[in-house]
């Protein structure tokens, strides 16, 4: 899965969740490391999420 698709999925998960979603959970669900999730969330925040 490329980064753009992964970040779109992260954005959808975060926006649809009523509670905070741990990075470890996102990493497991998307089959990437937690550090990749941290980097993706930083990019999403920089772009206004």
Provide a role label for each language-model segment.
Residues 35:
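Key DNA-contact positions within bacterial/archaeal DNA-binding proteins
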Residues 1-29:
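Extreme N-terminal segment that seeds HTH/winged-HTH DNA-binding domains in transcriptional regulators
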Residues 48-49:
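Short, Lys/Arg-enriched C-terminal cap helix and immediately downstream tail that follows
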Residues 41-42:
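Short, hydrophobic-biased segments on the C-terminal half of alpha helices
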